[in-house]
């Protein structure tokens, strides 16, 4: 079941690069990020209500609709800030480079996460490192081989920063998620992303209602 869920997630993640690339031609990165994040919040809020009625919550969390409120707030803010920074860097990078290169460089967190884990005290086994190496080779063959060259220009640097920030976000989620309901943590972090990206959009860009409507189609 978990393998199927990961395959579905990766399919959505991969196809989103095309939508992000097209969307970057019509609106700024913060406007695009704000639109898709508010849409994610609305979806997750409805999903939380449905799952609550079905009784599917994290048994490790305390009772009540909003479970482990203090940890949820703290975790949501930390994860949300990291997700905002990573997503903004990704959207900026996608606007200046190819989607294939963006996919490869963003996915470098596959390498960075176990490396970060070593510094935090975990000891990945040989099997994991072999899987990491195979993943990087596979990503290169899928995204870049015979199609593009890898060079660190402006957009590529932004995508490298994006991979580092996604690594931090994954490590934060890994820290907080055992204590919380996963859907609620996702909602709070996307709410943080929505608020921050909306503020940045109005400060650094000139968003319009038409741009928000168009972005909903892309996301």
Language-model regions, residue ranges each:
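Short, small-residue-biased leader/transition segments that mark boundaries at the very start
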Residues: 4-8
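Hydrophobic transmembrane alpha-helices of multi-pass small-molecule transport proteins
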Residues: 44, 124-145, 163-166, 197
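Juxtamembrane C-cap of transmembrane helices in multi-pass membrane transport proteins
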Residues: 15-27, 32-35, 39, 87-97, ...
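Transmembrane alpha-helical segments that form core, pore/gating elements
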Residues: 30, 41-44, 113-114, 119, ...
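Specific transmembrane alpha-helical segments of multi-pass solute transporters/efflux pumps
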Residues: 12, 16-17, 51-106, 139-141
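Cytoplasmic-side transmembrane-helix entry/capping segments in multi-pass membrane proteins
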Residues: 72-76, 124-135, 156, 181-189
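Juxtamembrane helix-entry segments on the extracytoplasmic side of multipass membrane proteins
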Residues: 2, 26-30, 34, 68-72, ...
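C-terminal transmembrane-helix exit sites in multi-pass transporters
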Residues: 43-48, 109-130
């Amino acid at each position: 079941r978990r393998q199927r869920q990961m395959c579905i997630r990766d399919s959505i993640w991969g196809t989103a690069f095309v939508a992000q690339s097209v969307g970057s031609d019509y609106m700024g990165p913060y406007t695009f990020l704000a639109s898709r994040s508010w849409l994610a919040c609305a979806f997750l809020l409805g999903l939380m209500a449905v799952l609550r009625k079905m009784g599917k919550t994290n048994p490790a969390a305390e009772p009540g609709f909003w479970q482990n409120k203090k940890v949820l707030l703290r975790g949501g803010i930390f994860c949300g800030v990291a997700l905002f920074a990573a997503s903004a860097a990704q959207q900026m990078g996608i606007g200046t480079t190819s989607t294939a290169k963006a996919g490869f460089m963003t996915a470098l967190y596959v390498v960075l996460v176990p490396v970060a884990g070593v510094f935090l005290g975990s000891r990945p086994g040989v099997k994991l490192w072999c899987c990491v190496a195979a993943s990087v080779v596979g990503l290169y063959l899928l995204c870049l081989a015979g199609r593009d060259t890898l060079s660190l220009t402006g957009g590529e640097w932004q995508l490298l920063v994006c991979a580092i920030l996604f690594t931090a976000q994954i490590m934060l989620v890994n820290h907080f998620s055992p204590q919380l309901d996963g859907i609620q943590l996702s909602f709070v972090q996307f709410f943080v992303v929505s608020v921050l990206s909306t503020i940045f959009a109005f400060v650094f860009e000139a968003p319009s209602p038409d741009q928000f409507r168009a972005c909903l189609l892309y996301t």
